[in-house]
């Protein structure tokens, strides 16, 4: 049943994405994180030790709660009817994937750049990146969009695919809970330096293997999409550690090498300057069409992940 649910969920995401009218599990997770953080901060001392404890409790409760609730719902649905159980798993597998949404948002950035509407392009890219965008040049907007497609190809598409192939929708949504915690709490600023540490470390562990598999898939994908596979391999080997996170530069470096452009570098977050290292070599200037090229590689890489994962699961069954 798991394999059918994964394939069905993949198709659902490719066809429909995440409709705006439908409440997404990640939104519910975000609300739970905010309320749990508020509850714990009000009851624990505001010392580093108190914040570390609060963050650890959050990092334990949300993933465990997500797995238990979704597992119980899937089991109850399957007990009522195998078809209902499959439908629930398929629906949640589709919601755990973000390929179509990522492609739509990044293509909107591309559309504004092509129209030379820089303010609109900045606004569009601000929906999918965490950095400050109000002063970005057209090149900076393009770079930000390509980077987010490359990074989210791993944690928004390939990693959830791998987890759902192992444990169905419950494990995929548990991964999304971990990923959501990191995106909300995993900042190294005054507010979250201690409270967000457990969430950030847990996300590093959850993404360690998937991010590296995603990078290798991206290298393979470059050969099938008219990009530079040798360059992708070379830059991945050289620059995959050029990030504070052990995972974020994995697919970014493979993407930069495949396209022959330079990504990353210094950026502003919440008004604060971060002197981050660059990734890749600027063999040519980055251009809006690179957003479309990155999307194409993201789709092909996710297709490879599904096909190879399904084949391995079928072989082991």
How would you label these PLM feature ranges?
Residues 1-174, 178, 186-317:
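Hydrophobic alpha-helical transmembrane segments
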